[in-house]
Each structure stands twice: as structure tokens, then as C-alpha cells.
Amino acid sequence: MLALHDKRVLLVDMDIGVRSLDILLGVSERTVYNWGDVVKNNVDYRKAVIDAGRNLFLLPAPIDFSEEYTPEKFSECIEKYKKDFDFIFLDSPAGLESGFLLSAKASESCVILSTRDNISIRAASYACENARKNGVSDVRLVVNKFNKKLHKKINVDEIIDTVGARLLGIIPDSQDIYAGVNGGDIPYDCKGNSAFLRISKRLCGENIPFRAKNL
């Protein structure tokens, strides 16, 4: 939604080896370089970026980890892109692998995505704690795949307290979203769009209240 509202957005895939964002964006066949090439100075940083359309761009992850991928060098890599984009999202995998630690060192803020299940909440809490340990003070939470009918007895405040982060938004459990993503299409027109719009406005600094009917 940020990209659709005249914001240039760069997605950085931090899932070294798996590299999933190129599939989700439908640009796998156009992937040539990655941020590892930029860190190693094998290619100009601009050539590593793929234009996914509608102000959305991708910087793919490398296939293998290298000792050259230090927090300092990776932060320098990300710094090069700041003048060209309004938002840069470092999409880290679940768990606290090298991708997460590199992301934390290079980030000014952190958005943690969690579902309602207890395992996901525990992982989100651990990620929040470690993000702060690595110098990220602004940590926010997005609750994903929330079903009002199934989760009537769930107190969202309890999730917030357990994770220890401010709530940024709640994404409904929508088949439209996941069908589009799995098909390599960005689901711009889906039932969850209002939730994405509220989240994007909050990221832009707008004061969008949380209402029970939107949960």
C-alpha cells in the first residue's frame, strides 16, 4: 500500500539460501544479482535491484552465507539505497539466524509479524527482545491471520504485552491474500486491503485509531 501511494519501497530479502521474495513478487526469472554482490563490490548497487512495478523494488538475498557479510559491511550496503527510497524493509526469516542479526544492526525500527498461536507469540517475543539488544529501540507488532470468529476469546492486549511491542496493525485471515501471494501476484485488490492501508498510514506517521470493528 505504501508503494501505491507514491512511496518508493525497497524490499530486501534477508532469507539467505531460501530467497522467497522473488517468488512472491513474481520476478524470479529476472533475478541476477543480490545484496551479497553489493557487499563484495562485485556489482554496482543499482544493478542489483529489480523493479517489481508500482514503486515496489526488490534486492534479492544471496544463495550462500559468506564471512564477508559482516554487520558493518551490510549496513554500508543498505546505506547506499537510502537516498533512492522512501522505505526500506529488511524481510528477515523466522528465528534468529544471520539474516535477522544483520537486519537488526542495519535498522532504525523493527516490525515483528506474529500469528495468534503460542509458538509464534513466543518467537515474536524473543525477536523483540533481541532486536532491542542489537540497538533497535522502535519495535512494533503486526498480528497476522487474525480470524474474529475463531479468536473471539483472544485478548489482543495480552499478545501485545507478551511480545512487548507496540501494535502497528492486525491483518485478517483472508484467502484472497494468500491465493494471490502463492500465485506470484501482489494482492492489491483483496479484502485485507483496509488493514494494509491503516498500517501504511501509521508507518507514515498518521494517527489512525484502533477500533474494535477493525479487529
Segments from the language model and where they lie:
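A conserved segment at the C-terminal end of the G1
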Residues: 1-14
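P-loop/Walker-type NTP enzyme "switch/lid" segment
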Residues: 11-83, 182-183
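Conserved nucleotide-binding/hydrolysis micro-motifs of P-loop NTPases
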Residues: 16-18, 54, 64-65, 95, ...
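Glycine-rich phosphate-binding loop used to anchor ATP phosphates in small-molecule kinases
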Residues: 82-99
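Inter-motif core of Ras-like GTPase G domains
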Residues: 97-118
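Conserved C-terminal guanine-recognition region of P-loop GTPase G domains, centered on the G4
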Residues: 122-135
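C-terminal lobe/tail of nucleotide-utilizing enzymes
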Residues: 133-215
